């Protein structure tokens, strides 16, 4: 796992958008970007990276009964090759699929999506904790 401290350059209103902009600036030198909602099987957040932040969720369209099943389905269809968790203090932890799987199994939970979004089970990351940061920095 690689670690990258990000400069705070974004002025986006949403936290997840700000962190994505800060990561984009660190890897491409470009900070402005129109945020869109692109299907995970058709594109990535930044280059070939999928960005996650505290309390993020994986796509609710994933098939499977367990977190491991849903991750396996995601990896079959995902356009991303690398996964990034950006901490509350703007540190990016860049992971491969194996590391990301271990991270999600340790710090993810299954929860039901809202009825307006179909009510399917989805994987949500827990809020950032000292235990999570210790795991990321080990």
Locate the predicted segments by residue.
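Short beta-strand segments enriched in small/hydrophobic residues
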Residues: 2-10
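Nucleic-acid endonuclease domains
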Residues: 9, 16-138
